[in-house]
Amino acid sequence: NNAINIATLCISAESIGCMTACYVKTVEYTKSREQFGQPISNFQVLQHKMVDMFIESEVCKSLLFKAMLECESNEGTKNKSVSALKAQIGLSGKLVAQDAVQFHGGMGVSDEMSIGHYLKKLIAVDALFGNSNYHLNKYSQL
């Protein structure tokens, strides 16, 4: 069980890296993409959506740090923290990557853009060691 927890922490850290990359690349892209004579990053609705992406990745980062500390100190709540982390990673990862693809339009799913690859990676990671539904159920039973 400890090995599964450590592996889950590792893939969660990787997922947070993917989410952060999606956010950073989206911000860069929206600054360079122009519509109606101005960068699309100037539109408030898109700014709010990008802030949501940032918040989702920061929530996951905080849960990762909490789970790492509890696994290190061998507290009885480490399984619960790891399940909370994995459930949130599954939900937030897909949300952030799907939003990034939407910002990039059709280019977001092309092989030339890394955003589509991050989406595929985050969907695959959700299935490893139990998906978000599995960990939500496990969390509620602990």
Q: Model-derived features: where do they sit?
A:
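Alpha-helical interface subdomain recognition
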Residues: 2-142
